[in-house]
Each structure stands twice: as C-alpha cells, then as structure tokens.
A protein has these predicted regions:
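Charged, low-complexity surface segments at secondary-structure and domain boundaries
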Residues: 31, 62, 116-118
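An amphipathic alpha-helical interaction surface
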Residues: 71-155
Length: 155
C-alpha cells in the first residue's frame, strides 16, 4: 500500500495549501470520504468516462515494460488524474485537515485497484510502479515531515 502515497502528488500540493486543519471535523471528513468511495454511481460514471482512455494506458504500460523512457508517472496520470483531482476537490469541499491526505491516498489506491480489476479482465501490472512511487513518497515526506504515516512508511 506504500504506493498509494504517490498516486496524487500533483493534487497534494494544491490540497495541502488550502484545506482547513480543524481536527474536530476529522471523523466527519473520513465518513464523507468513505461514502464517496462506496458510491457505486460515482464509480460507474467514472469508468464510463475513462473507458476511451484505456487504450492509451495500455500502450504506455507496454512501452514502459519494454524499457521505454516513459516514466510510470505518465501511465498513472493517464489513468488516474481526473479521479485524483475530483477527490482532492471533495476533500477541500469538506474542509479536510491535511493529515487526512494519507487516508485519502490509501482509500483511493485500494478502491481504484479493486474496481479496475472488477471492470477489466486485463489488469495493468501496478507492481512496476512501486519502486518509483516509494522514491516519490520519501521525497514528499522530506518536504512534509508532519505526516506520521509517511514517516513510518519511509523508515
């Protein structure tokens, strides 16, 4: 699950800079995040929208596996950027404290992976991204040492 931290780096800086740090709302925010991920219509709409993107994703994946100069980040953003930004905006709407970004990433990666597997018979190999994402995670932690989850995972 360490790879989850790397999923939405671009959105993270935007989110962290403007969201509220009110701890009293933490449980409410977590409940809203879970509700969003468990909303079947949300996922059905998302996968319908992304269906046309899968050919591009598969092409990038194959190129990367063959030693192309394309970084895993390109593949990931092709697949996940719209969803990551959408959910980041959701966190902002509910004034999520920035330490919930870890929760957001873990939920995002877990649910997205499971639902992609459900929707597609051929699942891209996410394992090829792990080393790259762990590196990015450590870089992120160095810049944002307040995150206890990142601190533990980067040890």
């Amino acid at each position: 699950m360490a790879a989850a931290i790397g999923v939405c780096f671009a959105a993270a800086h935007y989110v962290i800079n403007i969201i509220n740090t009110n701890k009293a709302r933490q449980s409410q925010v977590i409940m809203q995040i879970h509700a969003q991920f468990n909303n079947r219509q949300f996922w059905d709409d998302y996968f319908s929208y992304m269906e046309e993107e899968w050919t591009t994703v598969d092409e990038y994946r194959v190129r990367y596996e063959k030693g192309s100069t394309h970084e895993p980040q390109i593949v990931m953003w092709t697949t996940f950027e719209s969803l990551g930004v959408l959910l980041a905006k959701k966190l902002i709407e509910v004034s999520a404290p920035y330490d919930l970004f870890d929760e957001f990433c873990f939920l995002f990666w877990d649910k997205a992976s499971l639902l992609i597997e459900y929707k597609r018979s051929k699942v891209p190999d996410y394992g090829i991204w792990t080393e790259y994402l762990v590196k990015r995670m450590k870089e992120y932690h160095a810049a944002h040492p307040y995150s206890e989850t990142l601190k533990q995972l980067s040890a």
